[in-house]
Amino acid sequence: MEAIKPLPQVSSFSASVFSFLDGRFKESTDLSHSTGLVSELQTEISELDQRLAGLNRQLESGLAAYASFSDRVGGLFFEVNAKLADLSSSTSVTRSASDSGKEEEATEHVAGEDLPSLAKEVAQVESVRAYAETALKLDTLVGDIEDAVMSSLNKNLRTSRSSGFEEVRLHAIKTLKTTEEILSSVAKRHPRWARLVSAVDHRVDRALAMMRPQAIADYRALLSSLRWPPQLSTLTSASLDSKSENVQNPLFNMEGSLKSQYCGSFHALCSLQGLQLQRKSRQLGIHKGENVLFHQPLWAIEELVNPLTVASQRHFTKWSEKPEFIFALVYKITRDYVDSMDELLQPLVDEAKLAGYSCREEWVSAMVSSLSLYLVKEIFPIYVGQLDEANETDLRSEAKVSWLHLIDLMISFDKRVQSLVSQSGILSLQEDGNLLRISSLSVFCDRPDWLDLWAEIELDERLVKFKEEIDNDRNWTAKVQDELISSSNVYRPPIISSIFLQHLSSIIERSKSVPALYLRARFLRLAASPTIHKFLDCLLLRCQDADGLTALTENNDLIKVSNSINAGHYIESVLEEWSEDVFFLEMGTGQHDPQEVPGLENFTEPSEGIFGEEFEKLEKFRLEWINKLSVVILRGFDARIREYIKNRKQWQEKKDKEWTVSRALVGALDYLQGKTSIIEENLNKADFTAMWRTLASEIDKLFFNSILMANVKFTNDGVERLKVDMEVLYGVFRTWCVRPEGFFPKLSEGLTLLKMEEKQVKDGLSRGDKWLRENRIRYLSEAEAKKVAKSRVFS
């Protein structure tokens, strides 16, 4: 029987043994647990022995690999030394005086040929040496990482020596960073070593796959010990809008070792995430500053938000018909704890060198994401179902109101949480990527069909309200009087155009809340563009009604058309002004949905702008009806001047002493002046100018073709009569210009020819087109000038 070993001397115990025994045997009753302690220690010793054996095998393998590399490198060095010796002997042979020059040249030629190949072999040896050293160094580092990971997973180490466990994990993270630095250097300097990098990446990925879940599990355990999340049961609907003065924040209440453990765990998670981002940047070949393409939420912040989300959803289920309470609760939680993100956690993120991350921003983003996920899963399906199931008009109207109320809540919520982020001064809210992360409206990115539904509802509601304003005739007659809007005085639009712009501006303002550029443009094309088309249809219908009833012969119909043109031109000018705004210019860059959402054509060409098509249609409408007004007046003027034109004998009659203007022309000119004055009083100045200039051009053609080109004979008195009549005609247009005859070019130049002497005309026309230009006759062709000259009768 084996003798019982005596107990060791107490004086031989180390300080750590004393500390261990004191911790295990505080009282005499603890001696009963000694058997269990022995079993536990034996188990741990067995595990350590197994681990030691594994490390020995790994060491043997490493030494064997090193020996293999050493043998190979030694062999290469031996070959190089041998060739260097041969080279030395070939170049140091003593030449005798009798040696010929040919032998010397041959020896130097041989040595010169050997040098390049020798240099190449030396470079290969150096490359192999560098590869071997790098491979061994990486193998050692990865081995340290794997050891540290296995140690961190050891249950006994985790329970009995928490400080040692933290040190092991910290050492593993530092080693991972060192390994990543070497891999980055190798990837840049030695791209041919890709297989080495791939092999190391594979082993590191396995280590990280074990480290991250364990780090997250430890972090969750610490949060649980901190009693996170805080209690939400005390919340009531009355307290949702007010900020809690005595809010219980477990993060601020941490003390001592618990705070140290939490900060260490938070720092470890941030370091692991930063390391993963570096590895991903290297593997994708992305340079520093371009990692926004794969921005990841901060893991540690996500773990803070997840239990809060679970606790909040217990309240959400009670408020399914009161979504305003849901938004209020999420905002309250976000606001109450956002300060601790800056004060407590941001320094830890900075210490972990996790560039480009703001804890405040990540906290708000995570809370908004949790809300968006709940909206997608629980709220929106209910609202969509209500719209699909509502067959009756009243029920569908209620469903639309509920939908728009939900959108209003989302827009209001986004503005409030974005103000929380902007207070830090870090985030640029003008960037679509940032807006997507802190906007509840980002739900439409994955569900563009819901965006289309929203645009349809928005359009219907606006058109219903606008129709009531369209049917009010007073809105079409009263003018916009706003001294602050200079364009309103220029275009003299009716009130209906201002009302329309209010509805259109409201749609545009709501579109600004949509976080993605391509979705913003999609919404405007589905909601704003049809609104403009509807208004244009109303303008066109009013003009067509006036034209169809009286062919625009009544003054009221001319006023009606003039007001419609004013309204259209005013809207056209506003759209042109908007097209220069940055908000609309961005939509004209041709950017589209990266997922190429079907069902919507490319919304715009870069040169057109978002409302390019609508602008062109408004311009076409305006020009068409301006021309229509001039045609109507010309038609009436032509009907009243028929007798004057048919009287061909009047141009050969002798001059009367009291002769002023032809009586047959007076009535036509009175009609012309009366109708034009009516239009001047009601049409905006720019379009009226275009109208009377078009009218003058048509009257010029009418008189020229009907009188001067109609083979009429003119005596001296006839020429004088025509001159006087035309002066009266010019006088009608002198109200709007200084030199009206310039707008009757053919008539004026025809009179110039008629007033010339017979010899001057005959001699001049024989010189042809050159003579016409010298006499400033530019609008008449040579044939027309000759025909006018032939109509002159000289006495």
UniProtKB/Swiss-Prot annotation:
GO cellular component, one term: extrinsic component of endoplasmic reticulum membrane
Tissue/organ expression: Highly expressed in dry seeds. Expressed at low levels in roots, rosette and cauline leaves, stems and flowers.
Coiled-coil boundaries: 35-64
Main location: endoplasmic reticulum
InterPro entries: EXOC6PINT-1/Sec15/Tip20_C_dom2 (IPR042044), RINT1_Tip20 (IPR007528)
Region entry Disordered, spans: 91-111
Effect of residue 348 to F: In mag2-7; accumulation of precursors of storage proteins in dry seeds
Keywords carried by this UniProt record: Coiled coil, Endoplasmic reticulum, ER-Golgi transport, Membrane, Protein transport, Transport
Amino acid composition bias (Basic and acidic residues), ranges on this chain: 100-111
Presence of keyword Protein transport: yes
Keyword Ion transport in annotation: no
Compartments reported by the entry: Endoplasmic reticulum membrane
KO phenotype (gene knockout): No visible phenotype under normal growth conditions, but dry seeds of mutant plants accumulate the precursors of the two major storage proteins albumin 2S and globulin 12S. Increased sensitivity to salt stress, osmotic stress and abscisic acid (ABA) during germination and vegetative growth.
Domain RINT1/TIP20: 207-795
Topology within the bilayer: Peripheral membrane protein
Induction (UniProt): By salt and osmotic stresses.
Family as reported in the entry's similarity comment: Belongs to the RINT1 family.
Job description of the protein: Functions in the anterograde transport of storage protein precursors from the endoplasmic reticulum (ER) to the Golgi complex and in the retrograde transport from the Golgi complex to the ER. Forms a complex with ZW10/MIP1, MIP2 and MIP3 on the ER that may be responsible for efficient transport of seed storage proteins. Required for the responses to environmental stresses during seed germination and vegetative growth. Probably not involved in the retrograde transport from the ER to the apoplast.
Quaternary structure (record): Interacts with SEC20 and SYP81. Interacts with ZW10 (via the central region). Forms a complex with ZW10/MIP1, MIP2 and MIP3 on the endoplasmic reticulum.
Protein name: RINT1-like protein MAG2
Source organism (scientific name): Arabidopsis thaliana (Mouse-ear cress)
Underlying gene: MAG2
